[in-house]
Amino acid sequence: MKRILLFILTNVAVVAVLGIVASLLGVNRFLTANGLNLSALLGFALIMGFGGAIISLLISKPVAKWSAGVRLINDPQNADEAWIVETVRRLADKAQIGMPEVGIFEGEPNAFATGAFKNSSLVAVSTGLLQGMTKEEIEAVLGHEIAHVANGDMVTMTLIQGVMNTFVVFLSRVIGYAVDSFLRKGDSNSSGPGIGYYVSTIVLDIVLGFAAAIVVAWFSRHREFRADAGAAQLMGRKQPMMNALARLGGMQPGELPKAVEAMGITGSIGKLFATHPPIEERIAALQNAQG
């Protein structure tokens, strides 16, 4: 979940910043010089949309390291760390990808993989997961993350996010132009976009960006089933992954720190933004899979 949430939040921030920079550079004035030029706007939206998604992908690994406080295992300090590195190496060889960077971070049971390229990725696990699972279950979780990398999920999500960004940028400026035209009705002395346009587009870039995140999260939930199946294939059997999922389902997630408690998402709205399907559905999918 960390992998996709970080990508989505980074993407929203990048697109919003690019939108502000474009405004400061006078791009919006060009787009609205003689009414709203929809063809030019579409080209601008494509560049902004996919540009924002690609930038988010390229910085995903350093952002993940910083935000999660990942400590890379460059030189294993004990037998457990050596086992984690060797397990990741073995699974990566099976999946035919380059050896990822391996890291550990403090926190509740969790793990993630990220990175722009299959042969230059990062796999990280939390101390809570290492303390609460058997080695077989940990291996299954690592296999799940390796499967994400091997399946090219970050690139796939980037393409999906790029399409959604394009719609966000295009719609926000069309709506912003309509709002600005309404507010300045009868004002024949003004030229170029007004304050209504700039405020509307900045706000809509953020609001529609989160709406687009619902679609991205829906695709992410479907990719999780593939990663579960990939882990089972790498392990040679389904039971370890099923056991790991059952263990995760029975673990109590850590409480949110007070500083970010207001950003916690629960209930029906939370389900729309959920990047992972319910544990029960994932276990059932593995049970029903052939092999």
UniProtKB/Swiss-Prot annotation:
Keyword presence, Transmembrane: yes
One MF annotation (Gene Ontology) recorded for this entry: metalloendopeptidase activity
UniProt enzyme class: hydrolase
InterPro entries in the cross-refs: HtpX_protease, Pept_M48_protease_HtpX, Peptidase_M48
Transmembrane region(s): 4-24, 39-59, 159-179, 199-219
Catalytic residues, chain numbering: E145
Keywords (A to Z) from UniProt: Cell inner membrane, Cell membrane, Hydrolase, Membrane, Metal-binding, Metalloprotease, Protease, Transmembrane, Transmembrane helix, Zinc
Amino-acid positions noted as binding Zn(2+) in the UniProt annotation, renumbered to this chain: H144, H148, E224
Cofactor note: Binds 1 zinc ion per subunit.
Keyword Signal: no
Cofactor needs: Zn(2+)
Name of the featured protein: Protease HtpX homolog
Gene it is expressed from: htpX
